[in-house]
From Swiss-Prot:
Organism expressing this protein natively: Streptomyces ribosidificus
EC code(s) of this entry: 2.6.1.100, 2.6.1.101
GO molecular function: pyridoxal phosphate binding; transaminase activity
Enzyme class, broadest EC rank: transferase
Pathway assigned to this chain's UniProt record: Metabolic intermediate biosynthesis; 2-deoxystreptamine biosynthesis; 2-deoxystreptamine from D-glucose 6-phosphate: step 2/4; Metabolic intermediate biosynthesis; 2-deoxystreptamine biosynthesis; 2-deoxystreptamine from D-glucose 6-phosphate: step 4/4; Antibiotic biosynthesis; ribostamycin biosynthesis
Protein name: L-glutamine:2-deoxy-scyllo-inosose aminotransferase
Disulfide cysteine pairs (residue numbers): none
Keyword Transferase: yes
Catalytic activity: 2-deoxy-L-scyllo-inosose + L-glutamine = 2-deoxy-scyllo-inosamine + 2-oxoglutaramate; 3-amino-2,3-dideoxy-scyllo-inosose + L-glutamine = 2-deoxystreptamine + 2-oxoglutaramate
Gene that encodes the chain: rbmB
Names of required cofactors: pyridoxal 5'-phosphate
Amino acid sequence: MVSQLAVKGGEALRTRPWPAWPQPAPGVPDAVADVLGSGRWSISGPYRGTESYERRFARAFAAYNGVPHCVPAASGTASLMLALEACGIGAGDEVIVPGLSWVASGSTILGVNAVPIFCDVDPDTLCLSPEAVEAAITEHTRAIVVVHLYSALADMDALSAIAERHGLPLIEDCAQAHGATYRGVKVGALATAGTFSMQHSKVLTSGEGGAVITRDEDFARRVEHLRADGRCLSAVPPAPGAMELVETGELMGNNRCLSEFQAAILAEQLTILDEQNETRRANAAHLDGLLGELGLRPQTTSDGTTSRTYYTYAVRLPDGVLEDVPVTDVSCALTAELGFPVLPSYAPIPANRLYTPHTRRRYTLGLDHERRIDPKRFALPVCEDAARRTVTLHHAALLGDADDMGDIAAAFAKVLRHGAGLMH
């Protein structure tokens, strides 16, 4: 009966709490207290005779990802904008980006006065389609941004070959993929640069934060200037009380720096990232099997993937089932059963209510530019289909145990069984 669904007044399948997020590493309280009493709360504060947490985290995160350079930044959005500007992207340049992602994947490109060219995605991985990228390249294309979405890695073999063939920088947006590997190499280290977000929901978090990693020393130096008002860190420690930032005048920038509190948290959280990722992978593999028995299709990843990172567990509803029920209603029904948010996939960026360039006067740069950035010009059938039929769970649910995965599968089974009642 319809009443069996919790969203329709029935009894919820689960009332037990789920794992909390964030989960602070053991050393976080002491590290934050150390910053609090240090007299230096940011890299622009006076040098106190000891290495900043920002430098410590940058060195640790670079080593973790197998690259020589990491520049921390204020957010994932800031990191992507810094990488774009370090590539020389600017007014009128076209930047190819997947149409299925968080809205910032498009707005960051607008933010450097460039033109986002939204491309369709692979129907199974939900990541950028190499075929769509090849078809979208024009004489105005200046870069490709690839997003490793939810828990999948894009086809970096094909995308790297396309970028190399056309002489284009390739930027990896790894905001949802900290620690994932492709052919044994950490994501972010496979392209010109990799950008990361450390926002509250991410698997590596300091509330807000970001980073750019690269193998290119000159690129890293440009990013460093761009994020610190045109300044870079001194090559040698300054005298105590002096500023560690040097005014070189090489490249004008803005303030997109990370605070010492955030850097201290990240340095500690990095020490537990691999263990948490392994827990998520094991639970996701178990859940894949349970949901597969119900005819559901968990998101897959590209063939070159060595290890996945589960920021979000995404699953497609079975074909021919609940096709007349809005995915938002299915998500609400699952949420009611589990007491844990189950959300629809991202909307395609051009259709996202948050992506409205016309509401910002800074983007009114002439009729031609306004035409080029008009979201209505893009047709993205695979993105649209994925948004209609995909639901997602935040990675905190994957920090539980096998019983928790069983509850998730049972909730899906219940909603699939009684979901027709959602139409009334």
